Amino acid sequence: METFLFTSESVNEGHPDKLCDQVSDAILDACLEQDPESKVACETCTKTSMVMVFGEITTKATVDYEKIVRDTCRGIGFTSADVGLDADHCKVLVNIEQQSPDIAQGVHGHLTKKPEEIGAGDQGHMFGYATDETPELMPLTHVLATKLGAKLTEVRKNKTCPWLRPDGKTQVTVEYRNDNGAMIPLRVHTILISTQHDETVTNDQIAQDLKEHVIKPVVPAEYLDENTIFHLNPSGRFVIGGPHGDAGLTGRKIIIDTYGGWGAHGGGAFSGKDPTKVDRSGAYIVRQAAKSVVASGLARRCIVQVSYAIGVAEPLSVFVDTYKTGTIPGKDVLTLIKENFDFRPGMMSINLDLLRGGNFRYQKTAAYGHFGRDDPDFTWETVKVLNPQA
């Protein structure tokens, strides 16, 4: 039996790039909560003792950017310089301007356009992917890496492992078999966890706690065997972390945000962008389309691409591939997708309820993946049952 190895990584919410994603989306939440028509393109960067937010925002909302930055950093656990950043004493820089009027008139017609007429906020192409290898219809490598990162944060915040600090990375290698285009996970080959820790803990304690409190509750026992390799803090020391260890920037973890290297990616990041930015809304609707194809039993694996031109409402192209796993011809799958999903930006915002912010709606997406999450706010995970015409 021919097998292959595939690897996906994740980082948890204390990683500097992910801190930036969460700040950008916390600002988006604040804008949309007060003004659902807000136009937001918010970037964040961070380094030792400093967080800067910058970009273009046009909104009627009253937003205290500095408070949002400090609250978000504090919520992650950055409460002292020792752990990588002090939320209450770091410098916060803000350089926010309004959206270019050239873009505004081309996309929104200065808000005179009906929802179905609203053009894409930029050109670009986005991909959605789904696979039947997990209940989430997501790749197992990505699911495990992401859940290990989330569990690291959980046992840090609930004090199960009080030696943990906010920054951390995970990586999972799975051995697969290709079953005529469908992916069959056989076993977990390697688990890698690198987590920030305090000065007092020993490497033996780190390894013991990670196996017992992080890996054991997350990775199903049937995937582990005597040959599974564990690299637990292989560098030996990870005390300095967060923005003190590395600079961070919004939009630098786009593979972690999506499918862990499976499928494809058009290159556009998600966080800090309102739904007129098709980098985000387009990627959400093609995930819903691909997931619906697999959940409806039309294929075991599916990828969907959509593309846009700035200022144009209708997509330029829609593509689907079922990797030879389809139960009906590919052209029929494409027809069903076009009949059941409206790819115009204004309609995606309505159909997926994307103009609703606040209550951490978008901030939640900015750590532990945008897809495969069991949360009613992740409206794009709702399956539409697709019935082929007899």
UniProtKB/Swiss-Prot annotation:
L-methionine binds at residues 56, 99, 246, 277. Its main location: cytoplasm. Binds 2 divalent ions per subunit. The metal ions interact primarily with the substrate. Can utilize magnesium, manganese or cobalt (in vitro). Binds 1 potassium ion per subunit. The potassium ion interacts primarily with the substrate. GO terms for cellular component: cytoplasm. Mg(2+) binds at residue 9. It catalyses: L-methionine + ATP + H2O = S-adenosyl-L-methionine + phosphate + diphosphate. Its EC number is 2.5.1.6. GO terms for molecular function: ATP binding; metal ion binding; methionine adenosyltransferase activity. It holds the Pfam family S-AdoMet_synt_M. K(+) binds at residue 43. CDD domains: S-AdoMet_synt. It comes from the Eukaryota. ATP binds at residues 15, 167-169, 235-238, 246, 252-253, 269, 273, 277. Disulfide bonds: none annotated. Catalyzes the formation of S-adenosylmethionine from methionine and ATP. The reaction comprises two steps that are both catalyzed by the same enzyme: formation of S-adenosylmethionine (AdoMet) and triphosphate, and subsequent hydrolysis of the triphosphate. Belongs to the AdoMet synthase family. This is S-adenosylmethionine synthase 2.
